[in-house]
Regions:
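Condensing-enzyme catalytic core mediating Claisen C-C bond formation in acyl metabolism
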Residues: 1-51, 137, 152-204
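Conserved catalytic cysteine-centered active-site region
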Residues: 34-42, 54, 58, 83-136, ...
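Phosphate/pyrophosphate-binding loops at sites that engage ATP/ADP/AMP, CoA/4′-phosphopantetheine
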Residues: 63-76
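Structural alpha/beta core scaffold segments of enzyme domains
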Residues: 65, 133, 139-141
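Short loop/turn motifs at secondary-structure junctions
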Residues: 72-75, 134, 184
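Short glycine-rich or small-residue beta-strand-to-loop segments that form or flank ligand, phosphate
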Residues: 77-83
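Short beta-strand segments
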Residues: 82, 112, 137-144, 166, ...
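Short acidic/polar capping segments at secondary-structure boundaries
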Residues: 85-87, 115-116, 143-147, 153-154, ...
Length: 204
């Protein structure tokens, strides 16, 4: 309890969001969880992925629109989608192409199930695209619906993840034109600490 209280007060998280409406309604109006003792039958993976597919695209699309609203650049040549809380085929990349009316020739890359560092990997790929083609306009969008994967067992990992992670999306446009205003990507470095692999493990 002391560890959890410390993490809660030191986390710096003011607001957490969820695509699950149950948290604001009485049990009689729940849509995701069964209004039964013990929440049984507990939502299975199929239901979680169904909710992911219904909500992830909308969140990602809104994040991209907000990103484009802050720049003169409107042309997207490359699309990188990032997520580890859901996937399907056809995937999020195809859905976003249709929502954004992107040409079918748009270069698409999907980064799935890499976890918290996936956004850095996406930036690395976008940087490589831009160095190869100075006319590249790479849209990165990350979307995670963590609350869909809530587990009711009272383990430290489950409690910690429920405390830290929620639902949301963010987008960034990476371009090769250095004359544009904005942040610059200088270089990347990564390494793997073998003894700590289990610290960020997650299996379906």
């Amino acid at each position: 309890k002391r560890k959890l209280k410390f993490m809660y007060h030191q986390g710096g998280i003011e607001t957490r969001y969820s695509v699950i409406p149950d948290y604001q309604f009485e049990k009689s109006n729940w849509e995701f969880y069964p209004a039964t003792k013990g929440l049984e039958p507990f939502p299975n993976l199929e239901k979680r992925m169904d909710w992911y597919n219904k909500n992830a695209g909308t969140l990602a699309y809104e994040a991209i629109k907000n990103c484009l609203a802050k720049t003169k650049e409107k042309n997207i040549t490359h699309l990188i989608t990032v997520s580890c809380t859901g996937m399907s085929a056809p995937g999020l990349d195809i859905e976003l192409m249709q929502l954004l009316n992107l040409p079918p020739s748009t270069f698409r890359t999907s980064i799935n199930f890499m976890g918290c560092y996936a956004a850095i990997h996406a930036l690395k790929i976008a940087d490589a695209f831009c160095k190869t083609d100075k006319h590249a306009r790479v849209m990165i969008v990350c979307v995670e619906l963590c609350t869909l994967h809530f587990q009711k067992e009272k383990t430290l990992d489950n409690l910690t993840s429920s405390m830290l992670f929620a639902d949301g999306a963010a987008a960034a446009l990476v371009i090769g034109d250095e004359t544009e205003n904005g942040l610059f990507i200088n270089h990347f470095y990564s390494t793997v600490v073998k003894k700590r692999k289990k610290d960020m493990a997650w299996a379906l």
